[in-house]
Regions:
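Extracytoplasmic metal-acquisition and chelation regions
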Residues: 1-164
Length: 164
């Protein structure tokens, strides 16, 4: 996001050179906020034991987040939510959850919850137990997360609280 913010500030400064200082000041403020959010999120993720740092969701929308903060993503679907979900995908992921004793899986605000609920039932059928750890915001924001920074911090809180 820092790269995109700089690109936007540069383009606005090009279009409205008389406001360049204003755009640069806002950019620096935003970059500082992003840096603070990054540190906050890393601290929250560090509260989770390393062996529990699995982020399991309906689709693979959190790959970049997970890579940056040291989580492993496992998803029922890939990035697209349009593809069909097969029972084999649910079975394989349920086996993985039981094998790794994963405590929580997550629903997403913009994705139907049925596949995650089916995954939870498949884990129970195998004698395991996994909780739905909360709702994550991937393609949309929630009531209390009207900015990108508030959204990623809320996601970090939800993940950390469920997995630690």
């Amino acid at each position: 996001w820092a790269i995109q913010a700089k690109s936007v500030a540069d383009k606005l400064s090009e279009i409205l050179p008389e406001n360049k200082e204003y755009f640069e000041n806002n950019l620096q403020t935003y970059l500082k906020s992003l840096d603070e959010a990054t540190k906050y999120i890393q601290a929250k993720i560090n509260e989770i034991p390393e062996e529990s740092r699995y982020l399991i969701t309906a689709h693979d929308a959190f790959a970049y987040f997970a890579e940056q903060f040291g989580l492993q993503v496992k998803a029922i679907q890939g990035v697209s939510t349009d593809s069909e979900i097969g029972t084999k995908q649910i079975e394989d992921l349920a086996n993985f959850i039981v094998e790794h004793n994963i405590k929580a899986i997550f629903v997403e605000s913009s994705v139907n919850h049925k596949s995650i609920e089916a995954l939870q039932e498949a884990v129970k059928a195998k004698g395991g137990n996994v909780e739905i750890g909360g709702e994550l915001y991937s393609d949309s924001m929630g009531d209390k997360t009207e900015t990108y920074i508030k959204t990623i911090k809320a996601n970090a809180d939800t993940i950390s609280n469920a997995l630690k």
